[in-house]
Amino acid sequence: MYLRFWGTRGSIATPGRSTIEFGGNTSCVEVVTNSGVRIIFDCGTGARVLGAHLMAHGPKPLAATILLSHTHWDHIQGFPFFAPLFVPGNRFTVCAPKGAMSTLPEVLSGQMEYTYFPIELTQLGAQIVYRDITEGTHEMGDIRVSGQLLNHPAIAFGYRVQADGASLLYLCDHEPYWEPLWHSDSEPGKMESILHEGDRRHALFMKNADVVIHDAQYTPEEYPAKKNWGHSTYSYVTQIAAAAGVRRLFLTHHDPTHDDAFLTAIERRAQELASSMGSSIKVSCAREGHEESFQHEAHDKTAVTEIHNKDTSHAGSLIILIVDDDEDLRILARKALMRTGHVVIEADNGEEGLRLVESHKPNLVLLDLNMPGMDGFEVLRRLRARENGRSLPVIVLTAFGDEESARTSFQFGATDFLAKPFSPPQLDARVRSCFAHAEQ
């Protein structure tokens, strides 16, 4: 399997003398299997450079699958400048997770309206098939592609590609589900020591991968001011990848403010962190233009997580029960959820919440912990004791952002734990992720 980075920057392109080594173009990665199957991850501004290269040196006609992690601008802004799209006879399949409000062609055509661009999407000469991709494993030629929702304020997917006996993951954009990563009373660096179920699931997705390309936009010092923006720190990524048994790790989606000297320092700190954990993982910051071929090196592959084909595209029409005594919170959550097509019912106390579970059969529950009378822990305990409540997805929404509250919530059966405050897009993404994984 062949890999090349065409864009490594996050948020906005950052050309200039201070970004020559690591690159200034936004996200775009090319992977080619031994049999010639070509996959392109994301179409940031790096896609323009890739397109020019393929026009000069690529096969004629050209065929490729484009896997978009999500449709934020820095991941699609190179799409109209990808020259092979204009060539009749070329064939492309463009895949992305289904959004809540618009179809993939609508999103891509939005940036190509005449107000912004001289050519519309319908004028492209190549044959283009658009496909909403769901969580699960998909066969694409001689490769297997597995998709999994990431923790991001928009619906974003990470991808695991298995081909030529090797595995590669592309994970942009993703934020830790919880900080710190580890249980305080357990040994760091082990899968079972991960505190939040979401982070453990993320680690399982990476389990024993040969190559992982992961968003690592921030330093630990920068992260508190950027929390809920949907990006990781190099320390989180290095630790979780090492715990997952990853062999090769590329840190990418570099912050626009991080010049070459800064990224060199981040690379060194990440390598020192991996070494301090006793890990053999090889860590690098992704460099635009870097290319290498790799193959599977023998180590245990038996623990790779199995991802079931569960369609999350219909998660925009769930019946969601909000149980919270804070009316302002209920209003905020109701507006956010109804905007994406959910049906919302509400209770301001635990007793009423349990009654509504019986009478309205919700698909998912948002549950506060601190309520008068019956607190959220007791609601969870009673809910899980009922036949119809054992597998019901429950997201705990609480101002208690401490480890003990998170740990106790999971012990009582919570599916996810989200500390207040949160953004509406973040809530929608977590609802989709929670619903998708509740039955796995």
Regions found by a protein language model. Name each.
Residues 348-352, 375-381, 388:
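Acidic catalytic/metal-coordinating carboxylates
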Residues 1-183, 203, 259-304:
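Binuclear metal-dependent hydrolase catalytic cores
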Residues 177-281:
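Cap/insert and terminal regions of metallo-dependent hydrolase folds
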Residues 378, 401-418:
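Alpha4 helix (beta4-alpha4-beta5 surface) of REC/receiver domains from two-component response regulators
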Residues 404, 422-431:
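C-terminal output helix
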Residues 360-366:
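Active-site beta3 strand of CheY-like receiver
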Residues 331-339:
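Charged docking surfaces used in two-component/phosphorelay signaling
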